[in-house]
Amino acid sequence: MSVGMAAPRAAFACDPDASRGRLFDELPSKTRSPFRRDCDRVIHSTGFRRLKHKTQVFVYHEGDHYRTRLTHSLEVAQIARAIARQLGLDEDLTEALALAHDLGHPPFGHAGERALDACLQRYGGFDHNAQSLRVVTALEHRYPEFNGLNLTWETLEGIVKHNGPLTDRSGAPLGRYQAHGVPTGIVEFNRCFDLELWSHASLEAQVAGIADDIAYDAHDIDDGLRAGLFGVDDLGEMPLTAQMTAAIDVRYPGLDPARRGAELVRELISFLIGAAVAEAERRLIAAQPASVQAVREAGQDLIMFAPDAAEAEALIKAFLKRHMYRHPRVMRVMDDAETVVFELFARYRDHPADLPAEWLPANAGQGETEADRLRRICNFIAGMTDRYALTEHQRLFDLTPELR
C-alpha cells in the first residue's frame, strides 16, 4: 500500500456502531459517531486546555517555541491518525486516545510525577495513566448528569491499556505494576466498568502508544537542537541519524543549521511511521485477527517496531537521556520543580485552609479517610499548570525558584 493511502475499514478495527457503550446511557448523536464525540469531548475539556501550560522537559517560560503537553498531544494525534489510516483502523478513536493520553500528567513533567508519587507512597502512589482515567471519569465537571466525560468503553480501555495488559487472567499485576500493584483508581473503576485489564488493547490504542514514542523521539530532538543542548553533528553517533544527515547534506549542500535539523526531524518521523506500519502489516498477516476481540486476545501487541527499527529507536532514547534529560541545565530545573511540588503538597496537607474552597472536603471532611484526603490534595496539584504551580508557591511561600 502506498504511504498515506487510506485502507478500507479492517475487520479488526473498532467499530463505533458496535461500541460497548458508556457508563451512563446517553442518546446517540445524529451527526457524530461515539468515538468522534469522545474526541470532541476531550478537546473541549478543561484538562486538555491546561496541557497548554504543562511542560515535558523545559519549563513554560524557557521559550514559546518549545513543546508543551498540548502541542505534543496534537503531534501524537497527527502521527496516530496517519498510521491508523494506512491500517484501516478507526481514526476518530485513535485520535481521541492520542489526545487523552497525557491528561493525567502533573505540572513539570516527570519531575512533578516523581514528587507526587513520593508524597503518596503509603497510599498507592501516583500514576499518570491512573490519573488520566480519574480526570475523564471523575474530575471533569462539565455535564449535569455525571462527573467526568462519560467516554466510551473503548476510549477508557485505551487510556488505561495503551502500553499493554495490566494483569494476567488471574488478576496478578504485570510489568511496571508487579512491584506495587495496579493503581487503586484503576482497580476501583474497573469494578463498575470492566476494562478487561488482562487483555491487550485495541489496535487503535496500540497505535496511539507507538505514535507517542515517535513524537517524543523526533520532537525532543527538535527541542534539544533549538535549546543548543546538542547539534545535528552530535546525532551522528547513531547510525540511523548519521545516514539521514549524510543524505540531507548531499541533497541540500550548505543548508543552514536550523533547516538541516528540521529536515532531519521530518525524515525521522517518516521513517518511524513507515517502520511501524510495515511491521504492523507483517504481524497482522501472521496473526490474522478476525475481530477486535481477537486482537485483544492475541497474547501480544501487534503494533510494534521490527527489531532493527526498535534498536535504532532505543539508541535515540539513550542519546536523548544522555544529552537532554540528564543535561545539567535540565536536571537543575527539574530538581527545583520537584521541590515546588513537594512543598505545595506539604503545605496543603498541614494547612488545608490554604486550598481553594472548591477543593475543600464536603461535610467538613466527615467520613473522609487519610488516603482520600491526600488523594484530593494530589488531584488538585496534578491539575495545575506549571505557571499556576509557581504562582501558588509564590503566594504561599513568597520565595519560588525561577526554574531557569
UniProtKB/Swiss-Prot annotation:
GO terms for biological process: dGTP catabolic process. Pfam families: HD, HD_assoc. One of its GO terms (molecular function) is dGTPase activity. Keywords: Hydrolase. Residues 69-217 form the HD domain. The keyword Transcription regulation does not apply. It comes from the Bacteria. Gene3D superfamilies: Hypothetical protein af1432 (1.10.3210.10). HAMAP family: dGTPase_type2. Belongs to the dGTPase family. Type 2 subfamily. PANTHER family: DEOXYGUANOSINETRIPHOSPHATE TRIPHOSPHOHYDROLASE-LIKE PROTEIN, DEOXYNUCLEOSIDE TRIPHOSPHATE TRIPHOSPHOHYDROLASE. NCBIfam families: dGTP_triPase (TIGR01353), PRK01286.1-1 (NF002326), PRK01286.1-3 (NF002328). This is Deoxyguanosinetriphosphate triphosphohydrolase-like protein. It comes from Rhodopseudomonas palustris (strain BisB18).
